[in-house]
C-alpha cells in the first residue's frame, strides 16, 4: 500500500500514502486560492460601491431612524404607554407610573404602579422606607419616564405632565472601581460631586442612599449637607432616598423639601 511513516505519537503512529499526500497538497492549494479569490472579490465590490458610499450611508441613517421609530411605536402600543405633556415649570406629575423593564419581567398584573407629584413648592423629595421597599425602583421609574419622553417615546403611565430637563444626574447603586483604585465611598463622592457641580435649576438629580459607604454619622452629615445644598443653591427637581430617618426633620426647615415614605406589605 506504499505506507510511509509520517509521525510518531506517544500512543500511535501516523502513516501517509502518495495518494493522501497528493490530496493534502490539492486541499492546501485550494484553500490558498480561495483566500486570494475572496480578497479579489472584496476589492472589486469595494471599488464598485465606493462611488455611492455617501448615498449608502444616508440610506443606512434613514433605515436606522425608521428602526428606532418603529421600536418606540411597538413598545408603546404593546404596553399601553401614553404621550406625555411637557410644561415649562418644575411640575412633574405622573399618574400610575411604572418601571417599563421591571413590569415586563414580573407576572402580568402584579406590578404596583405609583403616582408622582412634584411642584415648585417642594422640588426635593426625601424618600425613606425599608430595604426592598421600592425606593430605588421608584426613582429609576421617574428617570426613565423623563428620558423616554424627551427622546420622543410614549411613557409607561396613565397620565404624564413633565418638564424638559437639560441634564439628568444619577447616583444609584454601590460599587468600587478596582482598576482606578477607588473605593465604594470614593466612587460615590465623585459621582455626587459631578452632579452638584454641573446641575442647574432645570436638571434632574437622583441620589440613592448617599453616605452609606462610610461611617454612620459621617454619612448622615454628608447626606444632610448635600440635600440642603441642592434645596438652597441648585433648586432643581431631586429625588433623594436615604436610610437616615433622622433627616426627615429637614421638611420643617421650609427649604422646599418634602418627606415621602415607601412602605412594603
Language-model features, listed with the residues they occupy:
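Interdomain "pre-motor" coupling segment immediately N-terminal to P-loop NTPase/helicase cores
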Residues: 55-77
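A conserved P-loop NTPase coupling/switch region
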Residues: 1-62, 88
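Well-ordered, non-transmembrane segments within structured domains
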Residues: 51, 65, 145-146
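ATPase nucleotide-binding head domains, primarily ABC-like/P-loop NTPase cores
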Residues: 2-13, 20, 69-265
Amino acid at each position: 500500500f506504499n505506507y510511509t511513516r509520517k509521525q510518531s505519537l506517544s500512543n500511535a503512529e501516523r502513516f501517509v500514502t502518495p495518494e493522501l499526500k497528493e490530496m493534502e497538497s490539492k486541499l492546501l492549494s485550494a484553500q490558498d486560492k480561495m483566500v486570494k479569490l475572496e480578497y479579489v472579490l472584496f476589492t472589486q465590490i469595494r471599488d464598485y460601491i465606493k462611488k455611492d458610499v455617501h448615498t449608502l450611508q444616508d440610506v443606512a441613517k434613514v433605515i436606522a431612524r425608521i428602526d428606532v421609530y418603529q421600536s418606540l411605536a411597538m413598545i408603546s402600543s404593546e404596553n399601553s404607554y401614553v404621550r406625555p405633556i411637557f410644561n415649562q415649570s418644575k411640575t412633574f406629575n405622573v399618574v400610575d407610573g411604572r418601571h417599563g423593564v421591571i413590569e415586563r419581567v414580573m407576572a402580568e398584573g402584579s406590578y404596583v404602579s405609583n403616582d408622582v407629584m412634584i411642584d415648585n413648592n417642594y422640588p426635593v423629595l426625601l424618600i425613606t422606607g425599608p430595604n426592598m421597599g421600592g425606593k430605588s425602583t421608584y426613582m429609576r421609574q421617574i428617570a426613565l419616564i423623563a428620558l423616554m419622553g424627551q427622546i420622543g417615546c410614549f411613557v409607561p403611565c396613565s397620565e404624564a405632565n413633565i418638564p424638559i430637563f437639560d441634564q439628568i444626574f444619577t447616583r444609584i447603586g454601590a460599587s468600587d472601581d478596582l482598576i482606578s483604585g477607588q473605593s465604594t465611598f470614593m466612587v460615590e463622592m465623585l459621582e455626587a460631586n459631578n452632579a452638584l457641580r454641573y446641575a442647574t435649576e432645570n436638571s434632574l438629580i437622583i441620589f440613592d442612599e448617599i453616605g452609606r459607604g462610610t461611617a454612620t454619622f459621617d454619612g448622615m452629615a454628608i447626606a444632610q449637607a448635600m440635600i440642603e445644598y441642592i434645596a438652597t443653591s441648585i433648586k432643581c427637581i431631586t429625588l433623594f432616598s436615604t436610610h437616615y430617618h433622622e433627616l426627615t426633620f429637614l421638611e420643617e426647615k421650609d427649604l422646599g423639601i418634602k418627606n415621602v415614605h415607601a412602605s412594603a406589605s
